[in-house]
């Protein structure tokens, strides 16, 4: 990886977004002998490692451990008990794993690709012939926009007047809440609802039609029965 002090700001490719998609595109192009400007903004690594799959699945697996112990009584002669004794410690362990994987899977890999120049100088703006970032123009005949996404706040009257969480901030809570209302019955809402319920939070799911609306109706009905 070359640093951002390179004398020339002309590249074969500019990639806006240093998440999994942008990272993969930059590395693939570098392996083909191209010069790439990989433009990030904020924390490297994107959604999956920072606020998506890695943190959520870590907490979900912890909830499964609690549920497994509590369900031991289903077998004759077994009894198990488990509860969340230190929520803050659980969140801290999740954050530590995220930090470790972000370093190993992203930051530590870049030095091995001389064709990639990583730039983190603020928001990027598309201009004719390339990208403008940090007050200078990066020229490139091709630009890949891989900026990812973020949780969307639904257009519900009054929602901005009350404290709300999203799939990111839920996993950053300093205290385990006694109760939660989750708006939305998609797969993300359902898996987070089950996770929090297994952690002892009282959870209510509010959805417009049915759980997992893109799945077969039979699946939705079966899931609703299980969650009840």
How does the language model describe each region?
Residues 1, 59, 195-199:
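Detector for methionine-enriched segments
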Residues 7-19, 176-183:
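Beta1/beta-strand and adjacent pyrophosphate-binding region of the FAD-binding site
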Residues 11-38, 189-198:
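N-terminal Rossmann-like FAD-binding beta1-loop-alpha1 element of flavoenzymes
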Residues 20, 149, 186:
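Flexible, active-site-proximal loop/turn residues at the rims of small-molecule/cofactor binding pockets
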Residues 174-215:
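Rossmann-like NAD(P)H-binding beta-loop-alpha module
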């Amino acid at each position: 990886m070359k640093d951002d002090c390179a004398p020339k700001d002309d590249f074969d490719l500019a990639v806006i977004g240093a998440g999994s998609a942008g990272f993969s595109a930059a590395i693939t192009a570098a392996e083909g002998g191209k010069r790439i400007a990989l433009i990030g903004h904020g924390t490297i690594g994107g959604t999956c490692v920072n606020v998506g799959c890695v943190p959520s699945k870590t907490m979900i697996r912890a909830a499964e451990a609690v549920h497994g112990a509590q369900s031991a009584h289903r077998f004759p002669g077994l009894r198990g008990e488990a509860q969340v004794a230190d929520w803050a410690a659980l969140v801290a362990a999740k954050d530590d794993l995220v930090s470790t994987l972000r370093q190993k899977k992203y930051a530590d890999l870049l030095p091995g690709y001389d064709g990639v120049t990583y730039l983190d100088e603020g928001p990027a703006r598309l201009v004719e012939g390339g990208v403008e970032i940090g007050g200078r123009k990066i020229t490139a005949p091709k630009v890949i926009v891989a900026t990812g996404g973020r949780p969307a706040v639904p257009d519900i009257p009054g929602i901005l007047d009350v404290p709300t969480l999203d799939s990111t901030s839920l996993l950053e809570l300093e205290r385990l809440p006694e109760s939660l209302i989750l708006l939305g019955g998609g797969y993300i809402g359902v898996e987070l609802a089950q996770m929090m319920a297994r952690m002892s939070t009282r959870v209510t799911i509010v959805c417009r039609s049915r759980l997992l609306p893109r799945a077969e109706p039979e699946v939705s009905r079966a899931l609703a029965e299980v969650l009840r």
